[in-house]
């Protein structure tokens, strides 16, 4: 997957099946070149993580051959990385530079030996010490080891790692992933395998990571649904489709164009998926001003969206979101709201007014109070000061991150259908299995017990549960986490055609840019800024307001010298 680089890794006829009738990978032949940047995309369950585990050497049960060129190292970021719970955060990060730590320790040990009689009275031992000291000095100079502490601080700051003395056993899932990523980047393996690297990173950390990987000398292979990440970093896209591995040269936007053309040649009648791809490609090709105009037009088209023919929408969209009852002019208004937990003030004097058909993206660092905002609106927690005024016509539908209302003992089909073959959706009865298929649950997947679902599958199921409740105001907490690009694209279109108001917590910049009419930004220091416009427009506005001097902003610097 490059034109003039050395092949460092090949897969020859690799196949993998989990059951006799479910082959995930089929006879894959691929060669990877040193320095290539490869993004892997495909539906959930298409074998992306399995492929990564095969390359990492963690999955041994497969057919075919995996061949590495000698002398190359491999590093792997799993979705749930293993960390030593007995260590502190910094001790785990330092594992990534253990060879440098060992070199410095040996250098200090040699210096101490110079003062011992058994060495300075023996010329041969002294010569050996001087020789070894010179070797170590060369290594220290080459790796800039004297500045190791500042590099560790830079890496931990860039990825928003928790305090360095924090015990690993007390870290959240997101914190563990950030610590594992920090350790891996410091290791600098020749082949860097990243499974959903942008999950649990805020926008500034993602921006830093993109710049780091653009300059990374080795090969980077990343499974991700973050399309801006794929656009900025990837030089190749590897699509996994029904077991086949299809390489495409270029970034995500290039793949979108090539894929659309290929589907156009293969299909006599345009499928829903092809039309969805074509509409996303149209958006990619839009000039910034045209995108802005599209967002503003939505705010003036409530009646048009509300009165669109439901059957036409269902035929057009992969994910159809029923509009719910008609919204009045008042949706939700925050007036002087404040909330704190002990000494930690999340926000103070929060004010905003949601428009009837706006799509509001909620952004900010982890722990800033975004989920708390939703819980306050839902009445699950109480404000310390101020009020949330909810309009009389509002019917809320809430998708949270915990998915607590999913019964682990029931199947996916039982949870959605409630034992009925037909479910009510948008004043129409539709087949429950057909509804589930829109969220990428095929026949066998619909019979899975909910307790056995992956994170992405649970996310899709909860989304399907909430959207069929026919709310006219949707509160979606990280709906884009752990779902594949196809489902993301379908969700974007469903929201774009939804006549009501949606408030969406997400770190997915492409998603935010494509659908949002407003941004509610948690900017630090308990400040929350409500902005009319897309994510990109908000970023421009933020730069004008805060400039490069804004102290929370991570500016890119290399972790280690080459």
Where are these regions (language model features)?
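Intracellular alpha-helical coupling/juxtamembrane segments of multi-pass membrane proteins
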Residues: 258-291, 295-301, 305-312
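ABC ATP-binding cassette signature C-motif
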Residues: 1-271, 315, 322-562
């Amino acid at each position: 997957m490059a034109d003039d680089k050395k092949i460092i890794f090949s897969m020859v006829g690799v196949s993998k099946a989990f059951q006799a009738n479910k082959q995930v990978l089929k006879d894959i032949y691929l060669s990877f070149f040193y320095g290539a940047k490869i993004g892997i995309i495909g539906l959930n369950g298409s074998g992306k993580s399995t492929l990564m585990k095969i390359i990492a050497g963690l999955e041994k049960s497969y057919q075919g051959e995996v061949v590495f060129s000698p002398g190359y190292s491999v590093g792997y970021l799993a979705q749930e990385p293993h960390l030593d719970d007995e260590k502190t955060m910094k001790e785990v990060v330092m594992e990534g530079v253990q060879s440098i730590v060992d070199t410095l320790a040996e250098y200090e040990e040699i210096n101490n030996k110079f003062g011992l009689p058994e060495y300075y009275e023996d010329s041969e031992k002294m010569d050996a010490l001087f020789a070894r000291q010179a070797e170590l000095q060369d290594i220290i100079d080459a790796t800039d080891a004297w500045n190791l502490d500042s590099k560790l601080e830079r890496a931990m700051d860039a990825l928003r790692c928790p305090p360095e003395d924090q015990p690993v056993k007390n870290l959240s899932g997101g914190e563990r992933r950030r610590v594992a990523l920090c350790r891996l980047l410091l290791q600098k393996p020749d082949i860097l395998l990243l499974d959903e690297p942008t999950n649990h990173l805020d926008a500034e950390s993602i921006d830093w990571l993109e710049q780091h990987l653009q300059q990374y000398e080795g090969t980077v292979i990343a499974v991700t649904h973050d399309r801006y990440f794929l656009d900025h970093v990837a030089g190749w896209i590897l699509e996994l489709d029904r077991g086949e591995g299809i390489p495409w040269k270029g970034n995500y936007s290039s793949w979108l164009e090539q894929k659309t053309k290929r589907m156009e040649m293969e299909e006599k009648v345009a499928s829903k998926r092809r039309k969805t791809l074509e509409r996303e490609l149209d958006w990619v090709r839009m000039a910034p001003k045209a995108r802005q105009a599209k967002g503003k037009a939505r705010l003036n088209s409530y009646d048009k969206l509300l009165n669109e023919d439901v059957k036409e929408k269902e035929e057009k969209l992969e994910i159809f979101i029923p509009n719910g009852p008609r919204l009045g002019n008042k949706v939700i208004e925050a007036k002087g709201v404040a909330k704190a937990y002990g000494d930690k003030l999340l926000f103070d004097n929060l004010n905003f007014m949601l428009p009837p058909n706006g799509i509001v993206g909620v952004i900010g660092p982890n722990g800033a109070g975004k989920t708390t905002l939703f819980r306050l609106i839902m009445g699950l927690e109480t404000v310390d000061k101020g009020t949330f005024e909810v309009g009389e016509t509002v019917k809320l539908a809430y998708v949270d991150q915990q998915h607590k209302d999913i019964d682990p003992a029931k199947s996916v089909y039982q949870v959605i259908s409630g034992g009925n073959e037909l479910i009510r959706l948008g004043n129409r009865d539709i087949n429950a299995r057909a509804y589930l298929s829109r969220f990428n649950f095929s026949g066998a997947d619909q019979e899975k017990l909910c307790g056995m679902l992956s994170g992405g599958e649970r996310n899709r199921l909860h989304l399907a549960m909430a959207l069929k409740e026919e709310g006219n105001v949707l509160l979606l907490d990280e709906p884009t986490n752990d779902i594949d690009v196809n489902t993301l694209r379908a969700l974007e279109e469903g929201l774009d055609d939804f006549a009501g108001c949606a408030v969406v917590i997400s770190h997915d910049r492409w998603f935010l840019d494509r659908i949002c009419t407003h941004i509610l930004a948690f900017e630090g220091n308990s400040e929350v800024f409500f902005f009319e416009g897309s994510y990109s427009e908000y970023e421009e506005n933020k730069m004008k307001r805060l400039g490069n001097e804004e102290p929370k902003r991570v500016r890119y610097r290399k972790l280690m010298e080459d």
